[in-house]
Regions:
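Formylglycine-dependent sulfatase
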Residues: 2-3, 10-18, 22, 28-478, ...
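Residues forming the ATP-binding cleft of Hanks-type serine/threonine protein kinase domains
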Residues: 490
Length: 534
């Protein structure tokens, strides 16, 4: 498999696989579809790239303080950048189910990673596209417990997958091990399908789902030495004391207390044992001798320094933060390089004018804000997710799009782009009105609904739901706690001061309560029966 650091051309396999014949559907078929500008043209293709845990602040098109991501910036520069993009449930499997179905978790049935299994019989946007004559393919992370449906071609990772020499489950029914680094391998498979396996007379929807940048942030060998001389700025909320926020205080995702010194920070030592040490040994045990030699050569001096100098207190906490940031950024670098390979292929084959290219993440992530790693909470860093698009000809919008969008909007967007009638039970809104014209629509949604279900579980984030508008956010933590939180995002963008119940907030609280009630009714969330809002 090609390494992203290899400047040689990608050698694609000489395979040709014909796609199944298109199935009849009641909606507009791709053979008669009109383009977004209402002129007859070829059906539009879709390339949907999604990463895992890539937070918006770690893309230079959103924030220039941390890392340069030239290929992701290229999408934003030549296309559109959504500045208010959010998820409905900030967790990997549930987010993927929302994206596939266009429905909130309580409707698609996949509430949590630990307790849910995706019902593959339910409608998804790939199934609708497939029936309309599109070829559909997915390569990479799936993470929904059942095998993919609605795809003509798929190869997926078992569970989270491995960064080095990963296993892939193939639709032929077997499991294969591919040699190399996962992000490059997924890109290889995707480009191979574009070049050699698809029927080039038909439109396609290609889903490229990366494991990167998921914990435990293991870089490619060629990127190991990057960022070692960089000291990243410590977030101003790093030493948050969680005053007035008992649910935030109860989490187990602190960089200082909960990062595993071996599994996460890679400080392997024969005399030190941790909860996740055996898992880490299994992970690095997948490396071949050359990969392991490069890995050990990089980390051993850092390990020696760590156990020699025995940092404590603030010094240790900030050392962990810097190690976490550096490893995360190395994985981002590989990801950006591989996105560039996809963009280069599409450009070299004159496909960009007829292809919607989407880049996003399954959710945001904490990079030391509030002292945390991971996601789950409705707070901004994890509810927000990056979303940039390269638009085909006929879609006129460029630059920043400030309207609030959510990952349940992707499915109806893809269907409308393909000329397929959006089913009434999809809860998301098609983004096509935001993309067609230079100025966008006069009216759009004014709030978003969120519901996180996975508790008790890893990181111990309490169950909660809430509503966010353009200024305020109201949340209710429930189950073994009954805690309301209200934030003024204009005055308190870091969400440090819970103003729920404070004098002078009665009118704001009442207004947000009614928005929350309306959202729960609109999306038919049964939680409203257990915790009714008057």
């Amino acid at each position: 498999m090609t390494n992203h650091c290899d400047t040689a051309s990608l050698l694609l396999r000489g395979l040709a696989v014909a796609a199944p014949a298109a199935l009849a559907v009641s909606s507009t078929s791709c053979s008669s579809q009109k383009n977004p500008g209402d002129n007859e043209r070829k059906p539009l293709n879709i390339v949907y790239i999604m990463t895992d845990d890539h937070t918006a602040q770690m893309m230079s098109c959103y924030d220039t303080r941390y890392i340069s991501t030239p290929n992701l910036d290229r999408i934003a520069r030549d296309g559109v950048r959504f500045t208010n993009s959010f998820v409905a449930n900030s967790l990997s499997g549930p987010s993927r189910a929302c994206m596939l179905t266009g429905k909130h978790s309580h409707k698609n049935g996949f509430l949590s990673n630990e307790m849910s299994v995706f019902d593959g019989e339910q409608p998804t946007f790939p199934k609708y596209l497939q029936k309309a004559g599109y070829q559909t393919a997915i390569f990479g992370k799936w993470h929904l417990e059942t095998l993919p449906t609605g795809f003509d071609r798929w190869e997926i990772l078992p569970g989270q997958g491995d960064y080095y020499n990963p296993r892939f489950i193939r639709q032929e029914g077997d499991t294969v091990v591919e040699h190399g680094y996962l992000t490059s391998i997924i890109t290889d498979k995707s480009l191979d399908w574009l070049e050699n396996e698809r029927d080039k007379s038909k439109p396609f929807a290609l889903i490229i789902h990366h494991k990167a940048i998921h914990r435990d942030w293991i870089a490619d060998t060629c990127d190991l030495d990057l960022f070692e001389d960089t000291d990243f700025p410590v977030p101003e909320t790093f030493y948050d004391d969680y005053a007035g926020r008992p649910a935030a205080a109860a989490q187990e995702m602190s960089i200082d207390k909960d990062l595993d010194i071996i599994y996460d920070l890679k400080m392997l030592n024969d005399t030190v044992d941790t909860r996740l040490k055996s898992t880490y040994l299994s992970i690095i045990g997948r490396m071949d001798s050359a990969q392991r030699a490069a890995f050990d050569a990089h980390y051993q001096p850092i390990i020696d320094d760590f156990y020699k100098n025995k940092r404590t207190g603030k010094d240790l906490a900030e050392w962990k933060f810097q190690r976490y940031m550096r490893d995360y950024m190395k994985v981002v670098k590989s990801l950006d390089d591989n996105v560039g390979r996809v963009l280069d292929y599409l450009e070299e084959h004159d496909m960009l004018d007829n292809t919607l290219v989407v880049y996003t993440s399954d959710q945001g992530f904490y990079m030391g804000e509030h002292g945390w790693f991971d996601k789950r909470f409705m707070y901004e860093e994890s509810m927000r997710t990056p979303l940039v698009m390269l638009l085909p000809k006929g879609l006129e919008r460029r630059g920043d799009i400030p309207e609030m969008v959510q990952n349940i909007d992707y499915a109806p967007t893809f269907l409308e782009l393909a000329g397929i009638e959006v089913p009434e039970d999809m809860q998301g809104m098609s983004l096509m009105p935001l993309l067609r014209d230079k100025k966008g629509p006069e009216k759009w949604r004014d709030n978003l609904y969120y519901h996180y279900h996975e508790y008790p579980a890893e990181h111990m984030v309490k169950r909660h739901y809430g509503v966010r508008d353009d200024r305020y956010k109201l949340m209710h933590f429930y189950n073994d706690i009954d805690q309301w939180e209200l934030y003024d995002l204009k005055e308190d963008p870091n969400e440090m001061h819970n103003i729920y119940g404070k004098p002078g907030t009665e009118e704001i609280t009442a207004r947000m309560m009614q928005k929350l009630k309306a959202a729960q009714e609109q999306y038919d969330d049964p939680i409203r029966e257990k915790y009714p809002i008057k």
